[in-house]
Amino acid sequence: MHGSPPSPRLSAWLVLAMLAMIAVPAGITLHTVHDPAVLEIPGTNPTPYGYSWSLLLFVVPIVVIGWWFLPSEGLRIPQRAFWRTIWILVPLGFGLDFFFANRFFVYPNAKATLGIGAPALGGNVPVEEYIFYFTGFLAVLLIYVWLDEYWLAVYNVSDYPSEAKHISRLLKFHLSSLIVGVVLIAAAILYKKHSQFPEGFPGYFTVLVIGGLIPSVSFFPTARRFINWRAFSLTIFMILLISMFWEATLAVPYGWWGYQQKQMMGLFIGAWAGLPIEAVTVWIAVTYGTTIVFEILKVWQASGKPARHAFLGEP
Protein backbone atom coordinates (compact mmCIF):
# COMPACT_ATOMS: atom_id res chain seq x y z
CA MET A 1 0.00 0.00 0.00
CA HIS A 2 1.26 3.47 -0.85
CA GLY A 3 0.80 6.31 1.61
CA SER A 4 -0.74 9.64 0.78
CA PRO A 5 1.18 11.75 -1.76
CA PRO A 6 3.66 14.25 -0.29
CA SER A 7 2.48 17.78 0.32
CA PRO A 8 3.59 20.53 -2.09
CA ARG A 9 6.00 21.80 0.58
CA LEU A 10 7.57 18.36 1.04
CA SER A 11 7.68 17.81 -2.72
CA ALA A 12 9.74 20.98 -3.15
CA TRP A 13 12.21 19.77 -0.53
CA LEU A 14 12.39 16.35 -2.15
CA VAL A 15 13.41 17.94 -5.45
CA LEU A 16 16.22 19.77 -3.64
CA ALA A 17 17.27 16.52 -1.97
CA MET A 18 17.34 14.73 -5.34
CA LEU A 19 19.57 17.43 -6.80
CA ALA A 20 21.83 17.37 -3.75
CA MET A 21 22.25 13.59 -3.72
CA ILE A 22 23.77 13.83 -7.20
CA ALA A 23 25.51 17.20 -6.92
CA VAL A 24 27.34 16.52 -3.64
CA PRO A 25 29.16 13.29 -4.61
CA ALA A 26 29.77 14.67 -8.11
CA GLY A 27 31.29 17.82 -6.63
CA ILE A 28 33.49 15.85 -4.24
CA THR A 29 34.72 13.63 -7.07
CA LEU A 30 35.43 16.54 -9.40
CA HIS A 31 37.31 18.31 -6.60
CA THR A 32 39.80 15.41 -6.46
CA VAL A 33 41.10 16.39 -9.92
CA HIS A 34 44.11 18.53 -9.00
CA ASP A 35 45.86 18.32 -12.37
CA PRO A 36 43.17 18.45 -15.08
CA ALA A 37 43.97 17.34 -18.61
CA VAL A 38 44.32 20.01 -21.27
CA LEU A 39 42.72 19.55 -24.68
CA GLU A 40 45.21 20.04 -27.50
CA ILE A 41 43.62 21.23 -30.76
CA PRO A 42 45.96 20.90 -33.76
CA GLY A 43 43.81 22.74 -36.33
CA THR A 44 42.44 26.27 -36.48
CA ASN A 45 38.83 25.24 -37.09
CA PRO A 46 38.12 22.02 -35.17
CA THR A 47 34.32 22.48 -35.05
CA PRO A 48 32.99 24.22 -38.20
CA TYR A 49 29.64 25.84 -37.33
CA GLY A 50 29.65 23.77 -34.14
CA TYR A 51 27.72 26.31 -32.06
CA SER A 52 25.15 26.70 -34.84
CA TRP A 53 24.57 22.95 -35.20
CA SER A 54 24.47 22.45 -31.44
CA LEU A 55 21.26 24.49 -31.22
CA LEU A 56 19.59 21.27 -32.39
CA LEU A 57 19.92 20.15 -28.76
CA PHE A 58 17.01 22.50 -28.08
CA VAL A 59 15.35 22.57 -31.50
CA VAL A 60 14.87 18.79 -31.82
CA PRO A 61 13.04 18.41 -28.45
CA ILE A 62 10.87 21.41 -29.39
CA VAL A 63 9.88 19.83 -32.71
CA VAL A 64 9.38 16.32 -31.32
CA ILE A 65 7.24 17.43 -28.38
CA GLY A 66 5.39 20.25 -30.13
CA TRP A 67 4.64 18.51 -33.42
CA TRP A 68 4.54 14.85 -32.40
CA PHE A 69 4.15 13.99 -28.71
CA LEU A 70 1.47 16.53 -27.82
CA PRO A 71 -0.66 16.22 -31.02
CA SER A 72 -0.45 12.40 -31.10
CA GLU A 73 -2.01 12.18 -27.64
CA GLY A 74 -4.64 14.81 -28.40
CA LEU A 75 -3.38 16.96 -25.55
CA ARG A 76 -4.57 20.54 -25.39
CA ILE A 77 -2.14 22.71 -23.51
CA PRO A 78 -3.24 26.05 -22.02
CA GLN A 79 -2.22 28.11 -25.04
CA ARG A 80 -2.61 31.57 -23.52
CA ALA A 81 -0.59 30.71 -20.42
CA PHE A 82 2.04 28.98 -22.54
CA TRP A 83 2.59 31.82 -24.99
CA ARG A 84 2.32 34.52 -22.34
CA THR A 85 5.12 32.79 -20.47
CA ILE A 86 7.24 32.76 -23.61
CA TRP A 87 6.47 36.40 -24.44
CA ILE A 88 7.45 37.42 -20.90
CA LEU A 89 10.61 35.37 -20.46
CA VAL A 90 12.17 35.45 -23.93
CA PRO A 91 12.38 39.29 -24.08
CA LEU A 92 13.92 39.19 -20.59
CA GLY A 93 16.48 36.68 -21.85
CA PHE A 94 17.18 38.86 -24.87
CA GLY A 95 17.55 41.87 -22.60
CA LEU A 96 20.03 40.09 -20.36
CA ASP A 97 21.98 39.02 -23.43
CA PHE A 98 21.97 42.55 -24.82
CA PHE A 99 23.15 44.19 -21.60
CA PHE A 100 25.42 41.52 -20.12
CA ALA A 101 26.71 39.17 -22.85
CA ASN A 102 29.94 41.12 -23.40
CA ARG A 103 30.37 41.60 -19.67
CA PHE A 104 30.03 37.94 -18.71
CA PHE A 105 31.11 35.96 -21.80
CA VAL A 106 33.67 35.75 -24.58
CA TYR A 107 33.37 34.10 -28.00
CA PRO A 108 36.90 33.12 -29.08
CA ASN A 109 35.98 30.65 -31.85
CA ALA A 110 34.13 32.71 -34.45
CA LYS A 111 34.32 29.84 -36.95
CA ALA A 112 31.94 27.81 -34.77
CA THR A 113 29.16 30.25 -35.68
CA LEU A 114 27.50 31.52 -38.84
CA GLY A 115 29.46 34.74 -38.50
CA ILE A 116 26.30 36.84 -38.23
CA GLY A 117 26.49 39.49 -35.52
CA ALA A 118 23.57 40.44 -33.29
CA PRO A 119 23.44 43.72 -31.36
CA ALA A 120 24.62 43.84 -27.76
CA LEU A 121 26.05 46.46 -25.43
CA GLY A 122 29.79 46.68 -26.01
CA GLY A 123 29.76 45.08 -29.47
CA ASN A 124 27.97 42.46 -31.52
CA VAL A 125 27.60 38.88 -30.30
CA PRO A 126 26.90 35.78 -32.40
CA VAL A 127 23.26 35.60 -33.51
CA GLU A 128 23.27 32.08 -32.08
CA GLU A 129 23.16 33.67 -28.62
CA TYR A 130 19.65 35.02 -29.15
CA ILE A 131 18.48 31.80 -30.80
CA PHE A 132 19.94 29.96 -27.80
CA TYR A 133 17.81 31.92 -25.35
CA PHE A 134 14.63 31.68 -27.41
CA THR A 135 14.88 27.92 -28.00
CA GLY A 136 16.09 27.36 -24.44
CA PHE A 137 13.00 28.85 -22.81
CA LEU A 138 10.76 27.13 -25.36
CA ALA A 139 12.40 23.73 -24.78
CA VAL A 140 12.22 24.01 -20.98
CA LEU A 141 8.55 24.95 -21.05
CA LEU A 142 7.54 22.32 -23.61
CA ILE A 143 9.34 19.55 -21.71
CA TYR A 144 7.63 20.56 -18.46
CA VAL A 145 4.21 20.87 -20.11
CA TRP A 146 4.47 17.48 -21.80
CA LEU A 147 5.60 15.77 -18.59
CA ASP A 148 2.87 17.55 -16.61
CA GLU A 149 0.03 16.94 -19.06
CA TYR A 150 0.93 13.41 -20.18
CA TRP A 151 3.95 11.48 -18.90
CA LEU A 152 3.42 12.39 -15.24
CA ALA A 153 -0.15 13.68 -15.51
CA VAL A 154 -1.34 11.54 -12.61
CA TYR A 155 0.61 13.84 -10.28
CA ASN A 156 -0.82 17.18 -11.42
CA VAL A 157 -3.74 19.00 -9.81
CA SER A 158 -6.83 16.95 -10.66
CA ASP A 159 -9.41 19.77 -10.69
CA TYR A 160 -7.30 22.72 -11.76
CA PRO A 161 -10.13 25.20 -12.57
CA SER A 162 -11.86 24.60 -9.26
CA GLU A 163 -8.64 24.96 -7.28
CA ALA A 164 -7.73 28.10 -9.22
CA LYS A 165 -11.06 29.76 -8.44
CA HIS A 166 -10.41 29.32 -4.71
CA ILE A 167 -7.18 31.34 -4.82
CA SER A 168 -7.89 34.76 -3.32
CA ARG A 169 -4.82 36.40 -4.85
CA LEU A 170 -1.83 35.20 -6.86
CA LEU A 171 0.69 37.75 -5.62
CA LYS A 172 1.98 36.59 -2.22
CA PHE A 173 5.32 37.59 -0.75
CA HIS A 174 7.65 34.71 0.13
CA LEU A 175 10.20 35.84 2.71
CA SER A 176 12.17 32.57 2.64
CA SER A 177 12.97 33.00 -1.06
CA LEU A 178 14.25 36.53 -0.40
CA ILE A 179 16.43 35.31 2.46
CA VAL A 180 17.82 32.47 0.34
CA GLY A 181 18.64 34.92 -2.45
CA VAL A 182 20.43 37.35 -0.12
CA VAL A 183 22.39 34.51 1.52
CA LEU A 184 23.42 33.03 -1.84
CA ILE A 185 24.66 36.38 -3.18
CA ALA A 186 26.49 37.18 0.07
CA ALA A 187 28.10 33.72 0.05
CA ALA A 188 29.21 34.19 -3.57
CA ILE A 189 30.80 37.57 -2.77
CA LEU A 190 32.56 36.14 0.29
CA TYR A 191 33.76 33.09 -1.62
CA LYS A 192 35.17 35.20 -4.44
CA LYS A 193 37.10 37.44 -2.06
CA HIS A 194 38.84 34.35 -0.64
CA SER A 195 39.20 32.40 -3.87
CA GLN A 196 42.17 32.17 -6.24
CA PHE A 197 40.45 34.83 -8.38
CA PRO A 198 39.45 37.60 -5.94
CA GLU A 199 39.33 40.42 -8.48
CA GLY A 200 35.95 41.61 -9.71
CA PHE A 201 32.41 40.87 -8.59
CA PRO A 202 30.27 37.72 -9.06
CA GLY A 203 27.92 39.54 -11.41
CA TYR A 204 26.76 36.54 -13.40
CA PHE A 205 25.79 34.57 -10.30
CA THR A 206 24.02 37.62 -8.88
CA VAL A 207 21.96 38.05 -12.05
CA LEU A 208 21.05 34.34 -12.03
CA VAL A 209 19.90 34.45 -8.41
CA ILE A 210 17.85 37.61 -8.90
CA GLY A 211 16.30 36.35 -12.14
CA GLY A 212 15.49 32.94 -10.72
CA LEU A 213 14.11 34.14 -7.40
CA ILE A 214 12.02 37.16 -8.41
CA PRO A 215 9.13 34.85 -9.46
CA SER A 216 9.66 32.84 -6.28
CA VAL A 217 9.62 35.86 -3.97
CA SER A 218 6.41 37.08 -5.59
CA PHE A 219 4.45 33.91 -6.30
CA PHE A 220 5.91 30.77 -4.71
CA PRO A 221 3.28 30.41 -1.93
CA THR A 222 0.61 30.25 -4.64
CA ALA A 223 2.52 28.34 -7.32
CA ARG A 224 3.75 25.63 -4.93
CA ARG A 225 0.29 24.06 -4.78
CA PHE A 226 -0.02 23.83 -8.58
CA ILE A 227 3.48 22.81 -9.68
CA ASN A 228 3.78 19.18 -10.74
CA TRP A 229 6.95 18.56 -8.76
CA ARG A 230 7.72 15.23 -10.38
CA ALA A 231 7.46 16.80 -13.83
CA PHE A 232 9.56 19.72 -12.61
CA SER A 233 12.31 17.47 -11.24
CA LEU A 234 12.54 15.42 -14.43
CA THR A 235 12.62 18.63 -16.49
CA ILE A 236 15.56 19.91 -14.46
CA PHE A 237 17.49 16.65 -14.84
CA MET A 238 16.87 16.54 -18.59
CA ILE A 239 17.93 20.16 -19.07
CA LEU A 240 21.01 19.72 -16.86
CA LEU A 241 22.01 16.64 -18.87
CA ILE A 242 21.75 18.63 -22.11
CA SER A 243 23.60 21.58 -20.57
CA MET A 244 26.49 19.56 -19.15
CA PHE A 245 26.99 17.70 -22.43
CA TRP A 246 26.80 20.99 -24.30
CA GLU A 247 29.09 23.11 -22.16
CA ALA A 248 31.53 20.72 -20.51
CA THR A 249 32.34 18.58 -23.55
CA LEU A 250 31.87 21.00 -26.46
CA ALA A 251 31.27 24.72 -25.94
CA VAL A 252 33.98 25.61 -23.44
CA PRO A 253 36.72 23.19 -24.61
CA TYR A 254 36.30 24.28 -28.24
CA GLY A 255 35.83 27.98 -27.56
CA TRP A 256 32.25 28.39 -28.74
CA TRP A 257 31.87 30.62 -25.72
CA GLY A 258 33.76 31.21 -22.52
CA TYR A 259 33.36 33.05 -19.23
CA GLN A 260 35.00 36.24 -18.02
CA GLN A 261 36.83 35.33 -14.86
CA LYS A 262 36.28 38.63 -13.05
CA GLN A 263 32.49 38.28 -13.33
CA MET A 264 32.38 34.73 -11.94
CA MET A 265 32.34 33.79 -8.25
CA GLY A 266 35.66 31.97 -8.61
CA LEU A 267 34.56 28.34 -8.37
CA PHE A 268 35.79 26.67 -11.56
CA ILE A 269 35.60 22.95 -12.39
CA GLY A 270 39.02 21.98 -13.71
CA ALA A 271 37.96 18.54 -14.94
CA TRP A 272 35.35 20.26 -17.14
CA ALA A 273 37.76 22.62 -18.93
CA GLY A 274 37.47 25.21 -16.15
CA LEU A 275 33.69 25.50 -16.38
CA PRO A 276 32.39 27.95 -13.73
CA ILE A 277 29.74 26.78 -11.30
CA GLU A 278 27.40 29.41 -12.76
CA ALA A 279 27.16 27.33 -15.94
CA VAL A 280 25.69 24.49 -13.87
CA THR A 281 23.24 26.64 -11.92
CA VAL A 282 21.90 28.76 -14.79
CA TRP A 283 19.49 26.12 -16.06
CA ILE A 284 18.27 25.31 -12.56
CA ALA A 285 17.35 28.99 -12.20
CA VAL A 286 15.78 29.12 -15.68
CA THR A 287 13.68 25.98 -15.13
CA TYR A 288 12.56 27.11 -11.68
CA GLY A 289 11.56 30.60 -12.80
CA THR A 290 9.89 29.38 -16.00
CA THR A 291 7.79 26.82 -14.14
CA ILE A 292 6.55 29.33 -11.57
CA VAL A 293 5.66 31.94 -14.19
CA PHE A 294 3.80 29.37 -16.31
CA GLU A 295 1.82 27.94 -13.40
CA ILE A 296 0.85 31.41 -12.16
CA LEU A 297 -0.38 32.43 -15.61
CA LYS A 298 -2.17 29.09 -15.92
CA VAL A 299 -3.94 29.64 -12.59
CA TRP A 300 -4.94 33.14 -13.67
CA GLN A 301 -6.32 31.78 -16.94
CA ALA A 302 -8.23 28.99 -15.16
CA SER A 303 -9.68 31.36 -12.55
CA GLY A 304 -11.48 33.45 -15.18
CA LYS A 305 -10.82 36.62 -13.17
CA PRO A 306 -9.58 39.96 -14.50
CA ALA A 307 -5.83 40.36 -14.06
CA ARG A 308 -6.12 42.96 -11.30
CA HIS A 309 -8.48 40.85 -9.21
CA ALA A 310 -6.54 37.64 -9.84
CA PHE A 311 -3.14 39.05 -8.89
CA LEU A 312 -4.09 41.53 -6.15
CA GLY A 313 -7.36 40.11 -4.86
CA GLU A 314 -10.95 41.27 -4.91
CA PRO A 315 -11.51 44.88 -3.75
Predicted regions located by residue number:
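Aromatic-rich, lipid-facing transmembrane alpha helices and their immediate juxtamembrane interface loops
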Residues: 2-315
